[in-house]
């Protein structure tokens, strides 16, 4: 099953505070483990929402909203896409992840739809 793994943004990540060199090295080693295990399909870190844009749809109208998105309760600062046996395997891999932020943080795992889900 394929899953997307979201690293939730924090106040620091939204300020553009870069991870320490130690954390970058630890995350690099972790990503190498994911690749060697054959589960990592992709992933990246995201820049703060101040650099983002949203396109709002209302019928045939479109409007562009510039970041930052202070009113949004939860933002994403990074993601992976993994191919795992099941959700339990994904949870076990997340538990092995270095804390992606200097302080408290959350990582969310969500299954992706497959073509067979729409058959």
List PLM regions with ranges.
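Conserved, structured core segments of small domains
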Residues: 1-119
